[in-house]
UniProtKB/Swiss-Prot annotation:
GO molecular function, one term: DNA binding
Protein's UniProt name: Probable transcriptional regulatory protein ABO_1803
Database matches in SUPFAM superfamilies: YebC-like
Localization of this protein: Cytoplasm
Family the UniProt entry places it in: Belongs to the TACO1 family.
Database matches in HAMAP family: Transcrip_reg_TACO1
Biological process terms in GO annotation: regulation of DNA-templated transcription
């Protein structure tokens, strides 16, 4: 599963405009998590992890507080998750995760990004079977065996552990996320996670031509411009 977090999703924080989009997307995700599971991060583990990740990505506190306050109010929009998939430039594959209050609008917007870049949107399962849905934890630790033992003692299904000069990357099935994180924290204290989330990781990467890369960049830009898009995963080798 190497290079898991190198291509995990398109960078969205290169300009102030992009940062605003990152804040908006975190705000929406925090609102949805708090509304469905409660606004107390100590009781809502999904919300707690999301807030921690938002802070790591330098999302301002007022953005987080606004989303929580909105969820406390009980009103507001009703967002539901949606996932689209298909083939991108050069035969590449893409998965697009959305949160939407209007599925018809969102599908039309995503389909337009595919159509305008000569890509092909597919039905559910078209390319998702070529991605692994995994929980990933990246943190500094010298003893790989101790980490594996702690996870196994907690009955966590560990898919793989990679060690890059003392920086460990732990992969588990996505359904093991909370159990794995709890086991790591209980065994080693409050670890400083560089990556701590659930992602879709391609089973293999593809190299595309310079011409296709230009179209791929346009494809990614169009998707990232859509307010409803939360994450874009692909199998293009950007190295």
């Amino acid at each position: 599963m190497g290079r898991a977090y190198q291509n995990r999703k398109e960078s969205m924080a290169k300009t102030s405009d992009m940062k605003a989009k990152v804040y908006s997307r975190y705000g929406r995700e925090i609102y949805v998590s708090a509304k469905s599971g409660g606004v107390d991060p100590t009781a809502n583990l999904a919300l707690r992890s999301l807030i921690e990740r938002a802070k790591k990505d330098q999302v301002p506190g007022h953005v987080i507080d606004k989303a929580l306050d909105k969820a406390k109010g009980g009103g507001g929009e009703d967002y539901s998750p949606a996932r689209y998939e298909g083939y991108g430039p050069g035969g590449s594959m893409a998965l697009i995760e959305c949160l939407t209050d209007n599925p018809n609008r969102t599908f039309g917007d995503v389909r337009m990004a595919f159509t305008k870049t000569k890509c092909k949107i597919g039905t559910q399962g078209t390319v998702s079977h070529m991605f692994d849905h995994v929980a990933i934890f990246v943190f500094a630790h010298e003893d790989e065996d101790a980490v594996l033992e702690a996870l196994m003692d907690a009955d966590v299904d560990v898919s793989e552990i990679e060690n890059d000069n003392g920086m460990l990357t732990v992969f588990t099935p996505n359904t093991e996320y909370f159990k794995a994180k709890q086991a790591l924290v209980e065994a080693f204290g409050e670890l400083e996670f560089e990556v701590d989330e659930i992602q879709f990781i391609p089973q293999s990467y593809t190299t595309i031509s310079a011409e296709d890369m230009d179209m791929f960049d346009k494809f990614m830009a169009m998707l990232n411009d859509l307010d409803d898009v939360q994450n874009v995963y692909h199998n293009v080798d950007l190295g």
